[in-house]
Amino acid sequence: MAACGTAVIAPVAGIVLEVTRTDTWDAKVNAGATRGGLSWSILGDDGIRYYGSHLSAIEAAIQPGVRVTAGQRLGKVGRTGDTTACHLHFGISPACTGAGDWWIRRGVVWPWTYLDAWRKGTPKSPASAVSAWQREHGCPKKPLTNP
């Protein structure tokens, strides 16, 4: 968990794919597409999609199609969408359609191995794990399980 308001930075250089600036999640509907609240996704220069959600704010300059650099501020940790505590949901996945495939975008490989390595300054790429997942699953057109 991270404290509310903690800066969220780009994990890699790349192009912004999606930005959600309005929290439309409703517990009565519980739609998977809106569970992340305020969120962003980036297609990294490594060909991997990175996703962050539950933010309280996203920087105005962060827009689809904009190039970001590793370490660039994207927003602030919050508790929008389907959550009660402040935290950043961080997903790593293949780019697939690039937009609209929330069931993939929210992450298909466990991110901690990479987050821990990056925190220590070790350049560890999730590319092989993401490629292995995609070889097995492809790019599903709908959620594989009940969201």
For each feature predicted by the language model, list its residue ranges:
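A structural micro-motif recognizing beta-strand termini
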Residues: 1-6, 43
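Short glycine/serine/proline-enriched coil/turn segments at secondary-structure junctions
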Residues: 7-8, 81-84
